[in-house]
Every structure is written in structure tokens, then in C-alpha cells.
UniProtKB/Swiss-Prot annotation:
Principal location: cytoplasm
BP GO terms, sorted: muscle structure development; positive regulation of proteasomal ubiquitin-dependent protein catabolic process; positive regulation of protein ubiquitination; proteasome-mediated ubiquitin-dependent protein catabolic process; skeletal muscle fiber development; skeletal muscle fiber differentiation; swimming
Tissue: Expressed in skeletal muscle and heart. Detected, although at much lower levels, in brain, eye and fin.
Ranges for domain BTB: 34-101
PROSITE patterns for this protein: BTB
Name assigned to this protein: Kelch-like protein 40a
Keywords: Cytoplasm, Developmental protein, Kelch repeat, Repeat, Ubl conjugation pathway
Length: 612
């Protein structure tokens, strides 16, 4: 008989612990050796003193003391509900507890009050896993209240990562001064501009001006004014109504103005700042070992390492390219991106992918749909969203008025009928619905949004003829309107908004590929010719990034290496338009990550990314 490997330490110990706990539970169920009854309101809980003392320092101290309770069989407990104590005792005897969002806070506080570390730790782990935007501030405050650094720091890190979303929540205004300070002093705050920190602080103060103005002298030391533009500091900070009339605050801000002129003051080590009074200062030369006051802190925040990147998304992974540094980063190694997808970056820099074919056998009425994914820069993962009904390809994807539009395209089924339908995803209700259809069926078109309006450009009709047609949709009026047509009918081209104009680059015409470029002036509703792209292409990616236009990839007709016959060939290069020289300049001959990818111009924090 084959011998079984047994850890001589771990397995017997675990077996003994289980045996002991099961035995104690059996004794309790049989009401054997019960020597203690916990009475809470009208509910009684029989138990064993030895078990309580072994589990809780609170009960151990009670039973070993000379207090009256140490001799009583019946112990009355207050400040706890019977249901909560019942769950705690169940855990003590069985290691089983059913935590929910409704009961976890009561159990957590009871575990803290009665010093039961095992339940305390279980509650901490549960709350860490349940951190979301709607509860992170409450969990942070709870961690501070119960003196639990592990929970408070986890919640604070979550808040710092999503600070610009958190400050919109009404709970933000309920933070106490010390709680707010603990957040906005962090280097890990995910903000690109320090102005956001100052504005959120003043918003918090103005929620209860009478009570909170007195907290400003201390809280202003959490803001890094030296990271702000001088013009903003002068106009918005010094000019703020709560600051310009306060002499104490003006004295504090004088330190910033001195620092802007190159004079840094340091706090004397021997001095102690008292509430409501300024610290004593001396010049840098007088005290080399002095400390800079907090108000002069100029360390960049975590979010200030955001960079303009070209993001390439395909089924092999997601890679970001930094044009200025000529460096590539892995944004996500996920290979779950569907083929034939479209991608979108919103004005809030949120990244989405729609496309592919998804089969759900449980949905008998509509088993086929398309994938809908959102990129989470915190985890570097693509998160599943409600799938798109009515799967399609060669459609347009755009955002306007906080909704995502899927416009036109071709059906992903036999016949591949061109579509005029428009699907809309409401980011408030998290649901797909139908919007007003296009005036005509179209696929392979270009689509952009600008100032809340959706522009549909060119494409092909059911008859496979290229279009010059351009129309605009106004979500506030629920109507489509025709605009001036393009000069050249085309489909499968690159398009982007740049300096309030819409650029259309290369594409497919009824006669083949084209290298022509034209520009639509939104203000005058007119088209004009532009500098041709250096090569005829289709499916070129055009992005606006950091005030410049970049053209990436696409397909060109290139000679076969053996037959010299022209064949469609995928290009993986990057071009940039030079406005001073008025020409397209190649900046990278080949970037393999662009193969089969959709391309976006985004801003991501390179500290989160893995450099290739």
C-alpha cells in the first residue's frame, strides 16, 4: 500500500484544532459544562467561561478579576444587539460567520469592543474586499475610529487612486478635518493638477463655512501650492474670498510667494507650531538642517506622472507607446480582446472596447451579442460590461453627453445587411437602448464627437458605393441633420478632431485606395483640401495627442516579395503631422504592437505600467 505524505507539524495541528472546536460546539449544543450565560436584553446565550476567556482578552480579564461579574453565572451585556452576539458566539464555536454589508459594521465594532481579534480580522478582510466608490469614505472613517491602520490605509489608498471621483460624493463633505488632511497630504493622490486638491479643499470648507474656516490654516499646509502655475495661485488662491480677507492665511501664503522668488524658509527644529499661530522661520542659510514647512512641499503627486501615450489594443495585449521618450509599456497583458472591435477614449480618459461575437445559450431570445469592455488602469485589466445587443461590424463608436453610441455598421450574420440603427449605452443606468436611427444605412464610416454633437462621415451604402455624405446628431434635440458633403467619397479612413476641425485621412474610394486628406471646418460648415498623406492607405488610425496629429498603421498595396504582384499589406508605422513644415513626418518605421490593433490617444500613468 502506497504511503501518504503527511506534514508532521501542520496537519496534526489543524486536525486537533478542528477536533477541539467541534467538540466544544457539541458540548454547547448538549448544554454540557455550561457555566456562563450572557444576557442581552431579553435574550440569553449559554456558553463556557473557558472558551470566552481563551478567545477574548476582555472576558479573560473579567473572569480573572475580583469584579462581581467574575463570580456570577449570568452576565448582562449592554451596547450590543442580541443578533450580533449570536453571530459572534457562533463564530467562536464554529469559525462560521455570515458577514453582509448590512451587519458587518455592527459585528466589527462589537469585535473591537469585546477584543475578539479573530472576528476583527475577518471583518477587516471582508471590508477590504468590498471597497467601492460608494462606501470607501465610510470604511476609511471606520478604520480610523477603531484604530485599525490596515483597514484605514487600504481605504485611503483606494480613495487616493480615485480622488477626482470621490470628491463628487456627498460623503466627502462629511469628512472631519483630520480625516481630510490624512487624504490630501498623500503623495499617492491620483491628480494631474494640484489645483484640483485646492478646489476640493475649498469646496469642503464652503460646505460649512462658519465652522470650517478656522481649519484652513492647518489644512492649507496639505496643499502643494508650489506645483501650481503662478497665475492660478495669484488669481484663484490669493484672490479667494475666504483667503484674501484673512491676515493669518495671507501670512502663510507669503511663504509661497517668497519661494516663487527663490527664497525658501525652513522651520526651526526647536520651534513648536501652536494651533492658530504661525511657526517661527529662519532662512535656508541660517539653518541647513531645518525642515521645510508643509505648505512649501513640492513633491509631485502620483497622478502627476500621467503621459500622453498612443495606445494599441489587440487580442495579443494592450501596449502604450510614449512618442517623446520613444518607450513602450505594457498596459494590459489580457488576450480577451475580441477581433474586429472598435475602441473609444472618452473626454474623461475612460477607455472602452466594443465588438466581436459573444454567444449566451441561456438567452434564448437573443443568444448573440457583442463584447463590451472597459479598461481599468488601476488593475491593468479589461472589465466586462453589459454586452451589446445586435452584434455588428464596421460600425462607428463615439461618446457624447455621457453616453456611448454604436452607429450603423453591418450585421454579423448571413447577408451582412448594412444598418441604420443606433444603439446607446447610458452610463448612469448601465443599460443599452435604441437611439434615433440614421437617415440612411451605412458601414465603414468615420465618426467623431465635438461639443456634445455626433458627426458621421462617409462610409459605404448597401450597394457598396462610397459616400460623400456627412450628417450630425444632436442628442438634446433627438435629430439628425445633413451637413456639407466631403469632396471625395470614401470609406475606411482615419478621422479625428484637431483644433475644432475634423480631419479625414486616406481611405477607400470607388476607384481604390487614396492618399488624399481633407478638413471640415465645423464653424463654417465647409470642406477644404489638405496635405496628402505620403502613401495610399485604408483603415489608417488617426489620433490627436498632446496637440498633434498622429497617423498609425493601416493597409497599403505593396509588391509581393516573390511575384511582385501588388497585395494588401498591413503597415505598422507611425507618422506625425508637422504644422510648421506643413508635412507628414515618419517617426517610427515599424512598431509590431500596432498589428491588428485599434489605436487611441490616451493619458496613462507610466508608474503603473511595465516598461518593455
Amino acid at each position: 500500500m502506497a504511503s501518504m505524505s503527511v506534514d508532521p507539524v501542520t496537519e496534526p495541528r489543524m486536525y486537533q484544532q478542528t477536533l477541539l472546536q467541534d467538540g466544544l460546539c457539541d458540548l454547547l449544543d448538549a448544554n454540557k459544562f455550561v457555566d456562563c450565560i450572557l444576557k442581552i436584553k431579553d435574550k440569553e446565550f449559554p456558553c463556557h467561561r473557558l472558551v470566552l476567556a481563551a478567545t477574548s482578552p476582555y472576558f479573560k480579564a473579567m473572569f480573572l478579576s475580583d469584579l462581581e461579574e467574575s463570580k456570577k453565572r449570568e452576565i448582562v451585556l449592554k451596547d450590543i444587539e442580541p443578533g450580533v452576539m449570536g453571530m459572534i458566539l457562533r463564530y467562536i464555536y464554529t469559525s462560521d460567520i455570515n458577514l453582509t454589508e448590512q451587519n458587518v459594521q455592527d459585528i466589527f465594532m462589537a469585535a473591537n469592543m469585546y477584543q475578539i481579534p479573530s472576528i476583527f480580522s475577518v471583518c477587516v478582510s471582508y471590508l477590504q474586499q468590498k471597497l467601492v466608490l460608494s462606501n470607501c469614505l465610510a470604511i476609511f472613517r471606520l478604520g480610523l475610529l477603531l484604530d485599525c491602520p490596515r483597514l484605514a490605509m487600504e481605504a485611503r489608498d483606494f480613495i487616493c487612486d480615485r480622488y477626482l471621483l470621490i470628491i463628487r460624493d456627498q460623503d466627502f463633505h462629511q469628512l472631519g478635518p483630520s480625516e481630510l488632511a490624512a487624504i490630501i497630504t498623500c503623495d499617492s493622490l491620483n491628480v494631474e493638477r494640484e489645483e484640483s486638491v485646492f478646489e476640493s479643499l475649498m469646496d469642503w470648507v464652503e460646505y460649512d463655512t462658519d465652522e470650517r474656516t478656522k481649519e484652513l490654516p492647518e489644512l492649507l499646509h496639505c496643499v502643494r501650492f508650489r506645483l501650481m502655475p503662478t497665475s492660478y495661485f495669484k488669481e484663484k488662491v490669493e484672490g479667494h474670498r475666504l483667503i484674501r480677507t484673512n491676515q493669518e492665511l495671507k501670512k502663510e501664503l507669503q511663504l509661497i510667494k517668497d519661494a516663487q522668488k527663490g527664497l525658501l524658509h525652513r522651520v526651526k527644529r526647536s520651534s513648536h507650531r501652536k494651533e492658530g499661530k504661525s511657526a517661527e522661520f529662519e532662512s535656508d542659510d541660517d539653518d541647513e538642517d531645518g525642515l521645510l514647512p508643509g505648505i512649501l512641499n513640492d513633491n509631485p503627486r502620483f497622478g502627476m506622472f500621467q503621459s500622453d501615450l498612443i495606445l494599441m489594443i489587440n487580442d495579443a495585449g494592450t501596449v502604450a507607446y510614449d512618442v517623446g521618450a520613444n518607450e513602450c509599456f505594457v498596459a494590459s497583458s489580457s488576450t480577451e480582446i475580441p477581433k474586429n472591435h472598435c475602441s473609444l477614449v472618452t473626454k474623461e480618459n475612460q477607455i472602452f472596447v466594443v465588438g466581436g461575437l459573444r454567444y449566451n445559450e441561456e438567452n434564448k431570445d437573443q443568444p448573440f451579442s457583442s463584447y463590451f469592455l472597459q479598461f481599468d488602469p488601476m488593475s491593468s485589466e479589461w472589465l466586462g460590461m453589459p454586452s451589446l445587443p445586435n452584434p455588428r461590424c464596421l460600425f462607428g463608436l463615439v461618446e457624447a453627453e455621457n453616453s456611448i453610441y454604436v452607429v450603423g455598421g453591418k450585421e454579423l450574420k448571413e447577408g451582412e445587411r448594412a444598418l441604420d440603427s443606433v444603439m446607446i449605452y447610458d452610463r448612469q443606468s448601465f443599460k443599452w437602448g435604441e437611439s434615433d436611427p440614421l437617415p440612411y444605412a451605412v458601414y465603414g464610416h468615420g465618426i467623431v464627437s465635438h461639443k456634445g454633437l455626433v458627426y458621421v462621415i462617409g462610409g459605404k451604402t448597401e450597394s457598396k458605393k462610397c459616400l460623400r455624405r456627412v450628417c450630425v446628431y444632436d442628442p438634446s434635440k433627438f435629430e439628425w441633420k445633413d451637413l456639407a458633403p466631403m469632396k471625395t467619397a470614401r470609406s475606411l479612413f482615419g478621422t479625428a478632431v484637431h483644433k475644432n476641425k475634423i480631419y479625414v485621412v486616406t481611405g477607400v474610394t470607388d476607384n481604390g485606395l487614396t492618399s488624399t486628406v481633407e478638413v471640415y471646418d465645423i464653424a463654417s460648415n465647409s470642406w477644404s483640401e489638405f496635405v496628402d498623406f505620403p502613401q495610399e492607405r485604408s483603415s489608417l488610425n488617426l489620433v490627436e495627442l498632446g496637440g498633434f496629429l498622429y497617423a498609425i498603421g493601416g493597409f497599403a498595396m505593396m509588391p509581393n516579395e516573390t511575384t511582385e504582384k501588388l497585395e494588401p499589406t498591413e503597415m505598422n508605422d507611425i507618422w506625425k503631422f508637422d504644422e510648421e513644415e506643413n508635412c507628414w513626418n515618419g517617426i517610427l518605421r515599424e512598431i509590431r504592437y500596432a498589428a491588428g490593433a485599434t489605436v487611441l490617444g490616451v493619458r496613462l500613468n507610466t508608474l503603473r505600467l511595465t516598461k518593455i
